Curated annotation (Swiss-Prot):
Annotated keywords: PQQ biosynthesis
Stated name of the protein: Coenzyme PQQ synthesis protein A
Function according to Swiss-Prot or TrEMBL: Required for coenzyme pyrroloquinoline quinone (PQQ) biosynthesis. PQQ is probably formed by cross-linking a specific glutamate to a specific tyrosine residue and excising these residues from the peptide.
Organism lineage string: Bacteria, Pseudomonadati, Pseudomonadota, Alphaproteobacteria, Rhodobacterales
Gene: pqqA
Organism of this sequence: Dinoroseobacter shibae (strain DSM 16493 / NCIMB 14021 / DFL 12)
A matching Pfam family: PqqA
Chain residue numbers at which the record places covalent cross-link Pyrroloquinoline quinone (Glu-Tyr): E16-Y20
NCBIfam families named among the record's database cross-references: PQQ_syn_pqqA
Stretches of the chain forming a coiled coil according to its record: none
Protein family: Belongs to the PqqA family.
Superkingdom classification of source: Bacteria
InterPro entries referenced in this protein's UniProt entry, alphabetically: PQQ_synth_PqqA
GO BP, sorted A to Z: pyrroloquinoline quinone biosynthetic process
Length: 32
């Protein structure tokens, strides 16, 4: 995992996924 520019997009995607479905958010936390 590259933590440079992609980190910003990852956070944005995480927020969008969190809004759409909490289930996906749990998987996101595991990835982080």
């Amino acid at each position: 995992m590259a933590w440079t520019k992609p980190i910003i997009r990852e956070i944005e995607c995480g927020m969008e996924i969190n809004m759409y479905g909490p289930d996906s958010d749990e998987e996101r936390e595991v990835l982080f």
